Amino acid sequence: MDNATVYHFVGIKGSGMSALALILHDKGFKVQGSDITQYTFTQRGLEQAGIDVMAFDEANIHEGLTVIAGNSFTDDHPEIKKAREMGLPVYRYHEFLGHLIEGYTSIGVAGAHGKTSTTGLLAHVLSGVAPTSYLIGDGSGKGTPNARFFVYEADEYRRHFLATKPDYAIMTNIDFDHPDYYTGIDDVYSAFETLAKQVKKGIFAWGDDPELRKLKTDVPVYYYGTSDRDDFQARNIKRSTTGSTFDVYHDDEFLGNFEIHLFGEHNVLNSLAVIAVAYFEKVNMDEIKHELADFKGVKRRFTERKLADMTIIDDYAHHPSEIKATLDAARQKYPDKEIIAVFQPHTFSRTIALMDDFAKSLNLADKVFLTNIFSSARETQGAVSSKDLAQKIVKGGEILTVDNMSPLLDFHDAVVVFMGAGDVQKYERAYEELLSHLSLKNN
């Protein structure tokens, strides 16, 4: 790390990039970055920190910079290209993260689903008991002075997490996703097993995942779940409209009764993983209980607001398994209300590869609406549309546009769940605006 340089982030509004920028800023380094001008949910944290965010322009690149390049951008990006031509140090995001975690007790959280929620929960709990730095995929990052722990989200896309060698790893699940890169479940498993062989102390893995049960590694693997064969087990789970309580056992030793104000079975499992890490780091269980009960969640993961007589939930879910978990959480908290799903499919390749599974998960809602497919920077077109998915949905499937969100006005005293990893929030904002105007008119 160099105090004389300015760290310039190409794509600073990316969720991981913004978190990394905040960490370096906290550590006292000079930080700036560039990105698209469109507003993103990560932007607020950068603005509050006073970090300069510029529009993309090769004129941003000059002597004295160390460039950290976001993984969405190729080496042909004008800023990255100019930096290389000038001989400036250029790191990819995951490479820089691999160097940054050295010198701490590091815990990487990997998995096709549940990474961000579990990373956020672990960061919150450990921060409450010891100095902790963290990087979360919701754009949150903190570089705490003299930190004992470094908690980070380990992204499997293009095997980027292999640039890190953590002390511990939590593996929430292995599932087929990112079909633009991975060829199938065996390819995904191969990436996770390679990561497992880089872990230094121990792995905490969900016991009901058949792929995770196959892991071959040089360090112990501790399984967590609800089965008698799991090393860390949740028993007597009670789910209510205020959250969940459960007893935790480790090899039949009772560790305590825990309470979380989170919803869905997946959050009980995420909490178990956090408890397991804390146990091996000899953290007091009473402190863990307090911190777990105090956690409110991470950005864009079951984020709620009330407007008129409606409950609006914003969630990052963009894979069938995530949609199922989010709708399960909504049912737990609002068992007597109608659940309406508004889903923005994310990337053409994922929509094609998982179409039947998307339809199956979405049909768990009482009514389903879709938006057009969100195309990523890596994939701008494809041979599929939301209409193809709509044909497989039995609970509706009408396609909404930002200019006309009025079909949602047919629902009253209900829950609308907006899901997607693209810009689904613009549909959410359009609906909220429509609802607000209607409320004012009626009053």
From Swiss-Prot:
Give the enzyme's main class according to its UniProt record, as a single word.
ligase
Q: What Gene Ontology terms describe what this protein does at the molecular function level?
A: ATP binding; UDP-N-acetylmuramate-L-alanine ligase activity
What's the short name of a Pfam family annotated to this entry? Mur_ligase
Localization annotation: Cytoplasm
The keyword Nuclease is assigned to this record? no
**Which pathway does this polypeptide act in?**
Cell wall biogenesis; peptidoglycan biosynthesis
Q: Which EC number(s) are documented for this chain?
A: 6.3.2.8
Gene3D superfamilies in alphabetical order: Mur ligase, C-terminal domain, Mur-like, catalytic domain, NAD(P)-binding Rossmann-like Domain
One GO biological process term = cell wall organization
Q: Keyword Ligase on this protein?
A: yes
- For the ligand (ATP), the binding residues are 111-117
- InterPro entries for the chain: Mur-like_cat_sf, Mur_ligase_C, Mur_ligase_C_dom_sf, Mur_ligase_cen, Mur_ligase_N, MurCDEF_pg_biosynth, UDP-N-AcMur_Ala_ligase_MurC
Q: Which UniProt keywords apply?
A: ATP-binding, Cell cycle, Cell division, Cell shape, Cell wall biogenesis/degradation, Cytoplasm, Ligase, Nucleotide-binding, Peptidoglycan synthesis
Chief subcellular location: cytoplasm
Catalytic activity as recorded in UniProt: UDP-N-acetyl-alpha-D-muramate + L-alanine + ATP = UDP-N-acetyl-alpha-D-muramoyl-L-alanine + ADP + phosphate + H(+)
Q: State any GO CC term.
A: cytoplasm
What does the sequence similarity comment in the record state about its family?
Answer: Belongs to the MurCDEF family.
NCBIfam families found in the cross-reference section: murC (TIGR01082)
Biological role stated in the UniProt entry: Cell wall formation.
Protein's recorded name: UDP-N-acetylmuramate--L-alanine ligase
Recorded source organism is Levilactobacillus brevis (strain ATCC 367 / BCRC 12310 / CIP 105137 / JCM 1170 / LMG 11437 / NCIMB 947 / NCTC 947)
Q: What is the name of the gene encoding this protein?
A: murC
